[in-house]
């Protein structure tokens, strides 16, 4: 993202920066986020817990963090630090190689234990949360690592896969996963396309941010318009154009 685009994205969500005086209207999505942690805290508040019966940990996306922390290098370094400190877990969501979900570790632990309570996999899951989760912040795990370093037997690994804690990456390798996250991913992909379609169908393929957020969300947008707009800006699927009447979202030239 070039400098101009980064600055416009930060303005769209109220990240503090110096600006020339002028009658620029405040944007409806304001935040005080100045760090990756603050951005995640803001974003998880937008996550519709009730939609998933509070069975999932609140999930933010790396792309959304970029909408609030304009310098991607800084954002990535801060996310890596939070990951190394064990405060967050980063999850490969699967619909895109760059689609990374972010959850607070304690939220992840709580929801996973709840999802596996009373099931045959509970023992393997508890062992994983106690031994692997605190020691390794990686997105994926290898066969030798699981069996030799952490002492898991093949049947236990199978139980972790069945529980949704791991998903197969390739032979002898697994991604860390969130049990039941498939429902979220389905909602997210449909919602992203629906919000993009709203901008695409607008005159000149551009739409005022305030107007977009003021509209009634289509049925496909179950995660909320604000949740998706953060993603669209951070993923560079729309450009932010400041005007005297507020930020304009515009589809990039192709």
Curated annotation (Swiss-Prot):
Segments of this protein annotated with the region Winged helix domain 1: 32-104
Sequence motif Bipartite nuclear localization signal, residues: 4-21
Protein localization: Nucleus
Keywords per UniProt: DNA damage, DNA repair, DNA-binding, Nucleus, Repeat, RNA-binding
GO MF assignments: ATP binding; double-stranded DNA binding; double-stranded RNA binding; kinase activity; protein homodimerization activity; RNA polymerase II complex binding; transcription factor TFIIH holo complex binding
GO biological process: positive regulation of Ras protein signal transduction; positive regulation of single strand break repair; transcription-coupled nucleotide-excision repair
UniProt region (Winged helix domain 2), positions on chain: 120-179
Start and end residues of each stretch annotated as Winged helix domain 3: 180-254
Keyword DNA repair carried by entry: yes
GO cellular component assignments: nuclear speck; nucleus; transcription elongation factor complex
Known function: DNA-binding protein which is required for efficient transcription-coupled nucleotide excision repair (TC-NER). Acts as part of a TC-NER complex which assembles and interacts with RNA polymerase II (RNAPII) when it stalls at DNA lesions. TC-NER complex subunit UVSSA binds to the GTF2H1/p62 subunit of the TFIIH transcription factor complex, tethering TFIIH to the TC-NER complex. WHR1/STK19 then interacts with the XPD helicase subunit of TFIIH which guides TFIIH to DNA downstream of the stalled RNAPII, ensuring DNA repair. Directly interacts with RNAPII and also binds to downstream DNA.
Family designation: Belongs to the STK19 family.
Subunit structure: Monomer in solution. Homodimer; when bound to DNA. Component of a transcription-coupled nucleotide excision repair (TC-NER) complex composed of STK19, ERCC6, ERCC8, DDA1, DDB1, ELOF1 and UVSSA which assembles and interacts with the multiprotein RNA polymerase II complex when it stalls at DNA lesions.
Protein name per its UniProtKB record: Winged helix repair factor 1
Organism annotation: Mus musculus
Underlying gene: Whr1
């Amino acid at each position: 993202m070039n400098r101009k685009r980064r600055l416009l994205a930060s303005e769209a969500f109220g990240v503090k920066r110096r600006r020339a005086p002028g009658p620029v209207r405040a944007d409806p999505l304001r935040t005080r986020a100045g760090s990756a942690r603050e951005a995640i805290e803001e974003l998880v508040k937008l996550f519709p817990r009730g939609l998933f019966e509070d069975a999932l940990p609140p999930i933010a996306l790396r792309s959304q963090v970029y909408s609030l922390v304009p310098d991607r290098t800084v954002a990535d370094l801060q996310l890596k630090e939070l990951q190394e400190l064990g405060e967050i877990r980063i999850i490969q969501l699967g619909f895109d190689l760059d689609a990374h979900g972010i959850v607070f570790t304690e939220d992840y632990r709580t929801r996973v234990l709840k999802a596996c309570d009373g099931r045959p996999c509970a023992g393997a899951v508890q062992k994983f949360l106690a031994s692997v989760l605190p020691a390794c912040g990686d997105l994926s795990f290898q066969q030798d690592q699981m069996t030799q370093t952490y002492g898991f037997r093949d049947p236990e690994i199978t139980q972790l896969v069945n529980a949704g804690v791991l998903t197969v990456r390739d032979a002898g390798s697994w991604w860390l996963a969130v049990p039941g996250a498939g429902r979220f991913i389905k909602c997210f992909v449909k919602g992203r396309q629906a919000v993009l379609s709203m901008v695409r169908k607008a005159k000149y393929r551009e739409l005022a941010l305030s107007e977009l957020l003021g509209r009634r969300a289509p049925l496909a947008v179950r995660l909320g318009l604000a949740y998706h707009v953060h993603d669209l800006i951070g993923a560079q699927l729309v450009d932010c154009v400041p005007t005297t009447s507020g930020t304009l979202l515009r589809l990039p030239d192709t």
